[in-house]
Regions:
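Active-site neighborhoods and metal-handling regions in enzymes and metal-associated proteins
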Residues: 1-269
Length: 269
């Protein structure tokens, strides 16, 4: 995403945090709906009900014509899966990406769920390492000089786990739009990246695969799949940077429970 980086006031960040906790609740409902025999449309409906009940709106529905409230991507589907009649089975990996808007301010977050709670050791390791990569990136943001410091932290975890970030798919700025400058790659890039500064709100979202980093888009013009059919995991949080620290906008505790192991204490905006 190119363009000017939108810097937020702390008051605006607080509205984004309201959107963020609605997204967190919607994803909790989606997680509970990821059971064997459920359709991906059922997962979407569970999240949509929470957003509607909270009086927020979906930022995915109608986005460039996207037909649902969430992206539900199963196994070899990396991101942007369209919810429908696909039936979930035990051992499936399901990533659910969801967003909400409150007073014009956006939240965006994603989780990966193992249907039925158990999967192969390789799949469990994939899901856990992708989650770890996200939190390593968030922790790095607390002290980062440039966006590239965040990218390096994410890629380091991926490398350790022998996983590959999907080429060309990156995190992004978020605020009055769901996708804004700057890009937040999940891998090191050449050249100088933007400097991290107070007022930035960023959606970090590692998308890691076991096999090749190459992807393709299906005929529905949305669903991104790994070219070799290997499974993928995807985790995402929206994070605010202000003068006194960082705050995970899509976690009710600001990310405190997960940042503790990194020695980072989030500070509310």
């Amino acid at each position: 995403v190119s363009g000017r980086i939108e810097l937020k006031t702390r008051e605006q960040m607080r509205v984004m945090a309201r959107a963020g906790v609605i997204v967190e609740r919607a994803l909790a409902a989606a997680r509970a709906a990821c059971v064997p025999g459920a359709r991906t449309a059922d997962v979407d409906a569970a999240a949509a009900a929470v957003i509607a009940e909270a009086g927020a709106t979906s930022n995915f529905l109608g986005y460039h014509g996207f037909p649902a409230t969430t992206c539900v991507s199963v196994n070899e589907e990396v991101v942007h899966g369209i919810p429908g009649d696909r039936v979930l089975a035990a051992g499936d990996l399901v990533s659910v990406d969801c967003g909400a808007v409150v007073e014009g301010w956006h939240g965006d977050s994603a989780i990966t769920v193992i249907v039925g709670g158990d999967a192969s050791r390789q799949d469990r390791a994939l899901v856990a390492a992708t989650d770890r990569a996200l939190w390593a990136g968030i922790a790095a943001l607390a002290t980062a000089d440039r966006i590239s410091d965040v990218s390096a932290a994410i890629e380091e975890v991926a490398d350790e786990a022998r996983l590959h970030p999907i080429d060309g798919y990156v995190g992004h700025g978020i605020g009055t739009q769901m996708h804004q400058a700057p890009d937040v790659p999940n891998y090191r890039t050449r050249g100088r990246s933007p400097r991290v500064r107070p007022g930035m709100c960023l959606a970090l979202e590692p998308m890691l695969v076991i096999g090749t980093d190459e992807s393709a888009i299906l005929n529905d013009e949305w669903t991104v799949v790994s070219v070799d059919g290997s499974r993928a995991a995807h985790w995402e949080h929206s994070v605010a940077v202000h003068e006194d620290g960082i705050w995970v906008l899509t976690a009710a505790d600001g990310g405190a429970s997960r940042l503790a192991e990194h020695g980072v204490v989030p500070v509310a905006p």
